[in-house]
């Protein structure tokens, strides 16, 4: 749970969480500050965490950075990236040729993973080449990236960051 991440993770792991899942440049300083603060007493609430990290939160971007910190902790606690990877890998096994995979992502980490997987059938690196030197990829992208229009965002503000990608499984 979040309490465990904040109060029991060592500095390198906290740094990894904030860097990998929050994409925070200040991850080393944030991790160090948390480690120092919890030596006195555990950090029990989001308000306490906010207070501990206050010196790293410039007023003009305070809410943005806090959102990234909370996002990073949530992703770690729920193992969201691992679950997404597992789902995408299973889609390869489950989908029949010409079957379609549609995925809505809500932040750049998810979208990067989905985009790379749909393009290469992998999460990192280049796809393998076949005997003739052609890339062997399991999907072809269908249409363009779909994002909500202004009207949709007015109806549902949380949709503002949503991105829908669609790919079709190729017969190999």
Specify the residue positions occupied by each region the protein language model found:
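S-adenosyl-L-methionine-dependent methyltransferase catalytic core, i.e., the SAM/SAH-binding region
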Residues: 1-172
